[in-house]
Amino acid sequence: MFFITMLQLYDKLLELPLFIGISTDELSDIVGQTKFGFHKLIADKPLVSMDDKCTQLFFLMNGTLRVISHADNHRYRIEEELSAPAVIQPEHFFGLMQRYTKDFIAQTDCSLLSLDKSEVLRLLDNYLIFRLNLLNSISMQAQRMSHIPWRQQPSDIRQQFVNFLRLRCLTQAGRKVLRITMEDLAQELHQSRLNISHMLNTLQRDGLLTMSRGIITIPQLETLRG
């Protein structure tokens, strides 16, 4: 456990997307009446794993989490980082599949707040701005996902690779680590292994990624996108 002053809690909540725009009076009520859980994770300790039930809404207040996304067939995975302030998969808190779809592990020492479902429902009932912020967050993600099938598919192999990463990453910038064999990547991109090898070696010569056996490290996805 860790201790946090009332003033620090006010300031941290205002940084979170679900609390942006809430008045000072309402925020004072929320802090005084809401049962927050306080959590401290040391580096390398897991927060939640893929398929765990999403029974609490976690808010990353300080630190950085390592996020791991697995392919359904478990033949490859992508690792990336999520820095504070952030909310952990709020879109899975309600609906048909109320389970986390990624592993979240402390990359550095992390401080988090949590709310159980009854507290979230109470906030949704009592505070319009909180309700709108959550709806906006879920709606934006749904709108982005619904647009994906209609995008023009890239014909250039480099852009196909970038698109492959972007569709599977939680954030569109920063360091990404793809753990995949050359053969599986070729299959995913519908390209020959030789074409994949040429493309990756060119990107490595340009300093945009590094390769080792079964591991592709992209220091900055936004730079790779060009």
Give the positions of each predicted feature.
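Cyclic-nucleotide recognition modules
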Residues: 34, 78-136
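Phosphate-/nucleic-acid-contacting segments
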Residues: 157, 166-226
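Glycine- and acidic-residue-biased ligand/ion/polar-headgroup-sensing regions
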Residues: 55-68, 84-85
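A cytosolic small-molecule/anion-sensing beta-strand core signal
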Residues: 42-43, 61-62, 83, 108
